[in-house]
C-alpha cells in the first residue's frame, strides 16, 4: 500500500470499484455524517442514508476512525486505512494462531498469511470486505477464550462488532463459527 502510494505521488492506483465507489462512499459519508444529514438525495434517486450505507461502512470501526480526517482528504487517507486494516487482520490472525502453535514464529507467519491471503489482496478493491477480514479472527479467538478458558466477556463484544460491521458477511461468519465449534468439540480441543 505505502510503496504504491509513494511511487504514485501519494495516490493509491487502482481501477474499478475502488475508485468509482469505495473512495467516493467514504468521502461522501464522511461529509454527510459531519453535516448531520439523514436522507441522501445524492444516493440513487434519493435514499435513507442508513439504508444505503450500512452494508458498506456505517458499522465499520475503520470508517468511524476516518471521521478525524476532513472529507476532502479522504482519497489520501484510504492508503493508511488499508494498511491499518491489514495490520489489524495480521494481529488477529496472530492472536488466534498463538493458542494453537508451540513456536510463536509460526503464529506470526499465520498472521501474515492471513492478512495477505489471496482473498484479501484480490478483494482490496472492495474496501468493506477487508473490514470483515480484519475483525473476524478476533471473534474466533474470543470463542476459543470463552470455551477453553471460560473467559466469556470478549465473545459477545466481537460478535456484536462483526454483526454491526457488515450484517451480510456476518451470516457466513456465524455459519463458520458453528462448524468450527462442532469440529473443535469433535476433535476434543473443546472440553464440553
Regions found by a protein language model. Give the residues of each.
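Membrane-embedded helix bundles of polyisoprenyl
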Residues: 83, 87-99, 105-187
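Membrane-interface coil-to-helix junctions
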Residues: 1-90, 112-134
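Membrane-interfacial entry segments at the cytosolic side of transmembrane helices
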Residues: 189-192
Amino acid at each position: 500500500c505505502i510503496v504504491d502510494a509513494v511511487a504514485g505521488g501519494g495516490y493509491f492506483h487502482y481501477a474499478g470499484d475502488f475508485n468509482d465507489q469505495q473512495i467516493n462512499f467514504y468521502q461522501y459519508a464522511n461529509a454527510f455524517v459531519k453535516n448531520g444529514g439523514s436522507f441522501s438525495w445524492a444516493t440513487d434517486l434519493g435514499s435513507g442514508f442508513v439504508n444505503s450505507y450500512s452494508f458498506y461502512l456505517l458499522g465499520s470501526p475503520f470508517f468511524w476512525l476516518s471521521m478525524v480526517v476532513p472529507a476532502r482528504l479522504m482519497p489520501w487517507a484510504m492508503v493508511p486505512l488499508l494498511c491499518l486494516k491489514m495490520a489489524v487482520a495480521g494481529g488477529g490472525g496472530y492472536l488466534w494462531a498463538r493458542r494453537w502453535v508451540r513456536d510463536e514464529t509460526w503464529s506470526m507467519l499465520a498472521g501474515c498469511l492471513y492478512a495477505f491471503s489471496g482473498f484479501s489482496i484480490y478483494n482490496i478493491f472492495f474496501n468493506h470486505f477487508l473490514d470483515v477480514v480484519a475483525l473476524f479472527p478476533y471473534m474466533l479467538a474470543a470463542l476459543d477464550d470463552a470455551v477453553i478458558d471460560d473467559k466469556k466477556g470478549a465473545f459477545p463484544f466481537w460478535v456484536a462488532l462483526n454483526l454491526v460491521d457488515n450484517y451480510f458477511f456476518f451470516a457466513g461468519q456465524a455459519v463458520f463459527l458453528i462448524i468450527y465449534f462442532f469440529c473443535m468439540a469433535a476433535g476434543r480441543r473443546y472440553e464440553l
